[in-house]
Amino acid sequence: MHAKRIFRACLLVLAATIGWQSPSVAGTAKGEDQQHAFDFHFGTWKTEIKSRDVTPSSVGEWVKFNGTVIDQPLWNGKANLEKIEASGPGGHFQGLTLFLYDPRSGQWSEQFAGSDDGTMQEPTYGEFKDGRGVFHGWTESGGKKVLERDIWSNITPDSYHYEIASSFDGGKTWVTNFVAQLTRLKKAPDYDTHYTPGTGPEHDFDFNMGRWSTRIQAVPHPLSSPAAKSSLGGTHEAYRVWDDWANIGQLEVDGPGGHRIEDLALRLYDRKTRQWRVYLANSTSGTLDAPVVGEFKDGVGTFVGMDEVDGKAVLTRNVWSDITAKSCRQDWAISTDGGRTWVSTWTSTDSRGG
């Protein structure tokens, strides 16, 4: 994880911690309880789907799918991760959706990725009111940006309805393109993920699965005070979401003042480019950063992206090295000169266990 994100989380950490609540119908979500609006969604569900292609000039026929949705809480309910797998006349697909709660706005974001390219789609944003969740954002249709609306409704402890619609006239009218009716199978999510051992690049992060203790040297202000470091400690746990294209790492760190800092890294494999995209978020901001992108070569993983430090746009680089069965190392650095020189911002050493 990146030092800047950790210390941003330290600055934004809530003055009071809101405790976890048992699953409840979303109609009770208001004020601070909005962060528990998705508690009803935790568990394992049967889904019946119908989907169709919609463009400004045509509306396709409905295609039906049947499958399973598994949703698990993260960060004590301030985030959740949904897995979906379904089959039908239109084929078979796997996907995941990450939901993040932003305590500053009191809203949720929703972002989907499919197994075909391992790329998070643009988010929709919204909240729940009177038992109904309404989210808005952008999507693409016919190569053009159009408005998208997602609605969660008819929510009971054992069922709910979900649909997606597009608007080609700025929100005046909407055309539904995706409908799902879900029925609960289990209150608890099925955490077990089928695993097929392999040596291809889609298995590059297999070494990291499990629980680790981590020691961190972080540089809070790498541009103005690159030599000033802070020592942090915590735990890092990684597990598979889908066998060969998605996994997640969660980091918990004891931050300043005894506050617990929670970060996650969602790692998605692109089968076409044979690269990984790593998306980062923390529970204090509740937003998903643009990914760092890269691959492993000769036992070293290198990932590069863009970031902002002290108001400046910079390159950021994440390197995994010294990988063994019981330990590994991560180095983060930034560059203000296009990658010619790098300033260290973060070094972590992980040991299995913790």
Where are these regions (language model features)?
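Bacterial N-terminal signal peptides that target proteins for export
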Residues: H2-C10
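A detector of low-complexity, intrinsically disordered, Ser/Thr/Gly/Pro/Ala-rich segments
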Residues: K4, A15-A16, A26, V314
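Hydrophobic small-molecule pocket/channel-lining residues, especially in calycin-type beta-barrels
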Residues: V25-G354
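Bacterial N-terminal signal peptides
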Residues: A9-G19
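N-terminal twin-arginine translocation
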Residues: Q21-P23
